[in-house]
Amino acid sequence: MKRPIVVINPNSNQSITDGLGECLARFNNNKSHPIECVTLKNGPFGIESQLDSDSVILPLANFVKTRPDAGAFVIACYSDPGIDTCRSVTSQPVFGIQESGVLTALCRAERFGVIAIADASVERHRRYMSRMQVLNRLAGEIALNITVDESANGSDTFSRLIEVGNRLKEMGSGVILLGCAGMARHRGKLQSELGIPVIDPTQAAVSMAVGALLPN
């Protein structure tokens, strides 16, 4: 029986979900646990504030409860909204992309940097990393100050990613973590430009989900 890894985009922007599907396509050679990317239709167009993040907690938990067929869930928003609540309503593993991305970055370099979408996101991310007890490994976090939609579709987003990535390198980052699921399609090109590892947190979370579902 196929038990999909369900990747949930908790905002209602379908283009973000489509971009996630493109970036995760290589994982679909796992026939037992295919990747299924879904959009939370009643979510905000972009999760850019604490209020946006809090507003999707119950809709996410309710969606998770409707999918007992899933092998695992990935919450594809860098704020990891509702991760504790979702874990409380299912026996399947639930992975948040910030938690997974940070843990992956720590395996690649002594210090990591994060590219956020907006200044308002940075404090929210730092609270979460404080909970994870990893702030001593954070070289810095710098915002692009764009919207979630622009992170995937903006005409000058890639040039801003290069600029901010180089600033984080100067601050001592040995690896860069993309702080928004919408940036996923830029990972490979950005890594080539910067010359250091660039982590897409959704790919990191799906990798962990695949590992969790390996047969004994």
Model-derived regions: residue spans:
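N-terminal beta1-alpha1 ligand-phosphate binding loop
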Residues: R3-N30
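Periplasmic-binding protein-like
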Residues: V7-I8, G71-C77, S173-C180
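Short hydrophobic segments within beta-strands
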Residues: I8-P10, V38, I115
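N-terminal beta-loop-helix "entrance" segment that forms/cooperates
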Residues: C37-A61, D149-G154
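Short, acidic/small-residue loops that bind anionic groups at enzyme active sites
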Residues: R87-R108, L190-A209
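Conserved beta-alpha
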Residues: G96-M132
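Active-site rim beta-loop-alpha module in soluble metabolic enzymes
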Residues: A120-C180
